[in-house]
Amino acid sequence: MNKISHGQELFLSRLRRHRLIVRFARVLILALFLILWEVCADTGIIDSFIFSSPSKIALCFREMVTDRSIFLHIGVTLYETIVSFLLVTLFSILLAVLLWCSRKLSEILEPYLVVLNSLPKSALAPLLIVWLGATPTTIIVAGMSVAIFGSIMNLYTSFTTVDREKIKLIYTLHGTRRHALFKVVLPSSVPAVISNMKVNIGLCLVGVVIGEFLAARNGLGYLIIYSSQVFKMDWLIMSIVLLCIMAMGLYAVIGVVEKIYQKRF
């Protein structure tokens, strides 16, 4: 039976206390911000029509939950984000592997990937609408366009920086490039893939919202544009808050996947 020393117990106690303080401080800052916002709106320090207030936003959310319209908008945005994220993850891994397998191809395509990654993706959205029409497919492609080029470059860089000695060992044992890929490169790059996924989930959400601004009839992005046009600031700020919560939730899911991987491997 393992026994924990006094020093270890003291360290764990301090660690738990530190985490508790951090969580309490986070909640306190948020609570103070909401209270200050509500007080300023009620006393007229800020214009409640323009800036709304937490109570108005909560009331607006309750009304949309009652008529269930908010679930449609959340579901549409969540579906498009997850699909675009999964496609980005799949295609970026496949293309990064292809570039790693062919040095000549990587040298040919590298400048194009750099240029495409540097393009402002919001400028591509109108072009995608013309090409694909105002459909959910267009929004999914818009979400992919924000993340995929940078993801390919990051994964390819990760593949090329794997320990060369391990790859040489594979070849010394008469292994092939395929063996090096599946025995060394991909297993060594799993942390980089997960790290990339954490970034991509947020980027895909941004791309989906940009697409919904221009080519949607449902979704939180559409709700933001519509509410800004009719000056319903309660709807607008509520939609932004829901997007923040969605982003945090999706990021947390990837974090859980990372912890499961770390515990198993």
Segments and roles (model prediction):
Residues L94-I129, M153-T160, K168:
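Cytoplasmic-entry segments and transmembrane alpha-helices of multi-pass inner-membrane transporters
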Residues V141-S145, R178-G211:
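Transmembrane alpha-helices
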Residues D67-C101:
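Transmembrane alpha-helix signature in integral membrane proteins
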Residues L119, F159-E165, L169-S189, Q229:
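Short helix-to-coil transition segments within interhelical loops
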Residues L72-E80, S122, V130-S151, I194, ...:
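Loop-to-helix entry region at the N-terminal start of transmembrane alpha-helices
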Residues V130-W131, V206-L243, Q262-F265:
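Glycine-rich helix-loop "coupling/hinge" segments at transmembrane-helix boundaries
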Residues R103, S195, I237-F265:
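C-terminal transmembrane helix and the adjacent membrane-cytosol boundary/short C-terminal tail
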Residues M1-I29, A252-F265:
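Transmembrane alpha-helical segments of polytopic membrane transport and secretion proteins
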